[in-house]
């Protein structure tokens, strides 16, 4: 009934298959919670299915086990306005690393995953997937800690995927905000955007060997994120594919990758792409980013080969700040309708579209920031992950 609370007794719950089903209301959600947050340990082959409306799951811990085949936590296709919060999934790995299951699967619409810790996935399958159909889902993923994920050595090691190739021309309206991605090295795509109208806002990507990739779909935005790469091998920034993508206000520090893993990579495309191929970049807008110590700050027409022959059309690179790059600009294929203006650079030769660095920037909290827009990085001012899991993490600039 609306307002009901189901309290799980503290201790180990081994191989539990929990089907949390109900219909709450906005004013009176139904809650499944731990007697003491973090003290309910779901071990063995436990799984959780969230199935209904206005449901809240709070304070659980999955550890010392693995799933036999099903995803660990699933929001069902009919689930709406429901929430997974203050919960941990840690090292929930099978012996067989080729076994594919996701740790969180989001179906339905208007659901939220927040203040969780999801760390240590080392087997096949994306960590968290938003599954799309022909309608927008408006999910929200915020204030989570996504901990280290080692390189998988195959496709399917993303930390987050939004959509699938089959529905990539549909819109998701999904927000990923105020999360920490710490050494998420599963594959080249840390976040793989495969749908339209998504926002990746104000996240920290710390020493990750990968990129945030506009893989399929159009009209998405990656803005005000922090990529603190510290020259880690294969670290990357943002990879652009598709139409009307926006890359604004990001801070990229010592990104060591090249071409597809450069600080900002604008890709070439197939002339007649299938849904799962590389679509032409059109009207990319890249502004107000601060790039410090990158191996390659910008790569245009990246990935050009015998198949990817179609250059970007309409690329605006304006009002960015680039400090001490190894290489400022690489052009693998010349975009049509390229606009580059008012970009300020220090520590590299001036080329068309770039001018000598002025005095717009100021160092604050170890980060170069615009003097008119000084702010404290969110992870220094906001609680991330479960309230009961006191991890002493520090994210330093090297």
UniProtKB/Swiss-Prot annotation:
GO molecular function: poly(beta-D-mannuronate) lyase activity
Enzyme Commission code: 4.2.2.3
CDD domains documented for this protein: PL-6
Reactions this protein catalyses: Eliminative cleavage of alginate to give oligosaccharides with 4-deoxy-alpha-L-erythro-hex-4-enuronosyl groups at their non-reducing ends and beta-D-mannuronate at their reducing end
Keyword Lipid biosynthesis in record: no
Enzyme class: lyase
Presence of keyword Magnesium: no
Keywords recorded for this protein, A-Z: Lyase, Signal
Pfam families the UniProt entry points to: Chondroitinas_B (PF14592)
Family (UniProt): Belongs to the polysaccharide lyase 6 family.
Name recorded for this polypeptide: Alginate lyase
Organism the protein comes from: Pseudomonas sp. (strain OS-ALG-9)
Gene name per UniProt: aly
């Amino acid at each position: 009934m609306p307002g009901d609370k189901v309290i799980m007794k503290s201790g180990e719950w081994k191989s539990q298959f929990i089907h949390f089903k109900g219909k709450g209301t906005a004013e009176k959600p139904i809650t499944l919670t731990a007697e003491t947050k973090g003290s309910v340990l779901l071990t063995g082959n436990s799984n959780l299915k969230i199935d209904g409306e206005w449901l809240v799951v709070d304070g659980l811990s999955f550890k010392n086990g693995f799933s036999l085949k099903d995803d660990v936590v699933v929001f069902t296709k009919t689930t709406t306005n429901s929430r997974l919060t203050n919960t941990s999934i840690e090292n929930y790995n099978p012996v067989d690393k080729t076994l594919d299951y996701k740790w969180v699967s989001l179906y339905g619409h208007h659901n939220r995953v927040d203040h969780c810790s999801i760390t240590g996935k080392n087997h096949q399958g994306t960590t968290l997937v938003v599954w799309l159909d022909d309608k927008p889902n408006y999910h929200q993923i915020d204030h989570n800690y996504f901990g280290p994920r080692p390189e998988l050595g195959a496709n399917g090691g993303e930390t987050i995927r939004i959509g699938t190739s089959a529905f990539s021309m549909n819109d998701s309206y999904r927000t990923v905000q105020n999360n920490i991605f710490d050494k998420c090295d599963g594959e080249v795509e840390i976040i793989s955007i495969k749908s339209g109208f998504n926002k990746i806002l104000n996240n920290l990507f710390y020493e990750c060997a990968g990129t945030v990739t506009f893989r399929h779909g159009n009209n998405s935005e990656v803005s005000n994120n922090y990529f603190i790469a510290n020259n880690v091998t294969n670290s990357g920034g943002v990879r652009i594919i598709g139409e009307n993508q926006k890359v604004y206000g990001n801070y990229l520090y010592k990104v060591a990758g090249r071409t597809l893993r450069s600080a900002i990579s604008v890709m070439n495309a197939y002339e007649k792409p299938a849904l799962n191929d590389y679509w032409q970049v059109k009207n990319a807008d890249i502004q107000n980013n601060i790039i410090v110590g990158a191996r390659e700050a910008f790569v245009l027409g990246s990935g050009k080969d015998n198949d990817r022959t179609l250059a970007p059309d309409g690329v605006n690179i304006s009002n960015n700040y680039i400090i001490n790059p190894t290489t400022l600009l690489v052009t693998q294929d010349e975009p049509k309708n390229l606009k580059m203006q008012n970009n300020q650079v220090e520590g590299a030769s001036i080329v068309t579209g770039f001018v000598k660095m002025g005095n717009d920037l100021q160092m604050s909290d170890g980060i170069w920031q615009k003097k008119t827009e000084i702010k404290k990085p969110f992870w220094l001012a906001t609680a991330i992950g479960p309230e009961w899991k006191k991890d002493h993490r520090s994210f330093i600039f090297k």
